A protein has these predicted regions:
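Solvent-exposed serine/threonine-rich low-complexity stretches and specific carbohydrate-binding patches
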Residues: 40-56
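A glycine-anchored, Pro-Gly-centered beta-turn/N-cap motif
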Residues: 52-59, 69-76, 80
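Edge beta-strands of extracellular beta-sandwich domains
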Residues: 47, 82-90
Length: 90
C-alpha cells in the first residue's frame, strides 16, 4: 500500500482544526486507519478513513485536541511507511 499524507499546516494553534490530505497512490480501496502519536511514540488519536476515494480530506476538530500538550506530533497510516508531522503551539 502506498499512501501520501499531507497536512494543510505544519504548525497548528490551539483552536484550529487539523486538516489532513490522504492520497492513495496504488488505488487500493481498503479502509485505512490514521493514527496520531506524541513525541514518546504513544498513539493518542485514531480515525478510520473510508476506502472509496483516491484522495480523502480528513478534518480533526479542534475540540478533539484541546487537552493535548504543546509539542510535536506524528501522523501515520497503519501499514504504510510514510508519515507526516506537525507542531501544536499556543
Amino acid at each position: 500500500m502506498t499512501v501520501e499524507i499531507t497536512l494543510e499546516k505544519s504548525i497548528i494553534k490551539y483552536g484550529e482544526d487539523i486538516i489532513v490530505l490522504i492520497k492513495r497512490i496504488d488505488s487500493s480501496d481498503e479502509p485505512l486507519s490514521l493514527t496520531i502519536h506524541d513525541e514518546s511514540d504513544d498513539s493518542i488519536y485514531a480515525i478510520g478513513v473510508s476506502g472509496d476515494k483516491n484522495i480523502d480530506r480528513v478534518v480533526i476538530p479542534s475540540i478533539d485536541i484541546e487537552q493535548w500538550d504543546c509539542g510535536k506530533y506524528f501522523l501515520r497510516i497503519f501499514g504504510s511507511k510514510y508519515s507526516s508531522s506537525f507542531e501544536l503551539i499556543n
